[in-house]
Amino acid sequence: MLLNRAWASQVLGSAVVLSTVAMRFVLWGRYCDNALEKRAPFREHHLAGLRQQQQDGLLITLGPTADSRQVFGIYEAESQEQVEALLHGDIYWREGIWVELSVYPWIQAL
């Protein structure tokens, strides 16, 4: 039984257990100038982290726009803070490859 987007109820015998339900979040960000060159030493580490996030069920998709100026991603997580922590822990953020990141709660219509 769904209580709302943030909480779900599961009935076990006569006990009701509340647990957090993952929500979806969209990421928009901006790459630094000359990102293709600057990212080279960090790319494998970055991709390994993204693969782990996918295996953990957090990252749905992430990648650059065709002109490599913007980054777009979709996450499924318990909170916006969790997504922001993942992004700020990414080597692309720490090394200045990503220079701007914005995360928004997202409701998928279809």
Task: Give the predicted meaning of each segment.
Residues 1-8:
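N-terminal chloroplast transit peptides
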Residues 8-110:
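Conserved, structured core segments of small domains
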